[in-house]
Amino acid sequence: MTFFNDVEKVQYEGPRSTNPYAFKYYNPEEIVAGKTMAEHLRFSIAYWHTFVGDGSDPFGVGTMQRPWDQYSGMDLAKARVEAAFEFFEKLNVPYFCFHDVDVAPEGETLADTYKNLDEIVLMIKDYMKTSKTKLLWNTANMFTHPRWIHGAATSPNADVYAYAAAKVKKGLEIGKELGAENYVFWGGREGYETLLNTNMKLELDNLARFFHMAVDYAKEIGFDAQFLIEPKPKEPTKHQYDFDVATGIAFLKTHGLDEHFKFNIEANHATLAGHTFEHELHLARIHDMLGSVDANQGDTLLGWDTDEFPTDLYTTTLAMYEILKNDGLGKGGLNFDAKVRRGSFEANDLFHAHIAGMDSFAIGLKVANQLLEDRVLEDVIDNRYKSYQSGIGQKIANNDTNLKELEAYALSLGEIKHSSGQQERIKATLNQYLLRVNEY
């Protein structure tokens, strides 16, 4: 069965192409900084938005027209697998990601859910035998069903905690069976609405215990995946415990989990936390905890997670700058956790959206690499902090001074002189590099 009959395999045609089903900048074989674009840009398709999302919102029903939606139940799940691998092949993407309930419906009991999952996982595994597309990561959905109303690993109900543990155990087994390179934890319901009825310490300790059990079980079954935490400050919960990268680092280090986890950073979640995307990437990178990326963008005029496809070239450039500085994402990738707009309801809009996102990150890669080759920002930063390369500054940087010595030095100073930060000049230079992308 085929679902995208009027779309051929998407090819690179160059910046002057007017073909809406062609890449203008993403050339998977093009060499950038010693690697192909495909090696740098480990693109992934989000199963939930692409094959499950129906376009509904709090004010209206679904609008998406999907040829596989003529089916229901397990027949629908199987049709989505067929549609997914056709889409992967035509877009030539190396990875995909899913939550357990994306690929198979929940049953009346946990055992029924396992049975459904086993059947669909077997089907996915069979398709993967003849496909180049691999599983970047999988995860357990522990936020949609009413059982998660008060959380999963942070629920005040121990029965729910046990159910969540069972879901993750099954998820780890599925990840191993399908060769997932990572496993993600996103705590959409792990947080609180009010402190008036919350034992925060118990909830955080229980969450840490949960993660330790997951680490132990992955080792027990030989599942060598990178564990990832995906920060988000709010939505659906008022205050989520994985608020941002800084909060996540504090939690992981406090509970002795930092050796086992890195971060899966989503652009729109950074926006909701009051940060830029590059801020979260940078902070994770300098702590050696940048693991993977959910590639999307938010709307700064709106206060919720809009999950738009990434087309902001400034953002993709600065994101790829951080990723290149990180020497890539290792086992991670660029997962399009993004959905077409509610008014973009035709199935072929899925191709337009992903092509736009892939081209945007290809541009970001080329511009970021040129910035690095020309040491545009490195020279600016080195010059700005040059006072720490000699004299008293070098002693500070080398932990070779104390308050007494610094006081004596300060007393000997005359008027302190500053250098301009030159933000406007730097931004103008970035504009130049973006506008010259076709030269690189």
UniProtKB/Swiss-Prot annotation:
Compartments in which it is found: Cytoplasm
Annotated positions binding Mg(2+) 2: 266, 269, 305, 307
EC numbers, comma separated: 5.3.1.5
Co-factor binding comment: Binds 2 magnesium ions per subunit.
Cofactor section: Mg(2+)
InterPro entries the UniProt entry points to: Xyl_isomerase-like_sf, Xylose_isom_bac, Xylose_isomerase
SUPFAM superfamilies: Xylose isomerase-like
UniProt-annotated binding residues for Mg(2+) 1: 230, 266, 294, 337
This protein's GO CC annotations: cytoplasm
Record bears the keyword Endoplasmic reticulum: no
Protein name: Xylose isomerase
The organism's taxonomic lineage, starting at the top: Bacteria, Bacillati, Bacillota, Bacilli, Bacillales
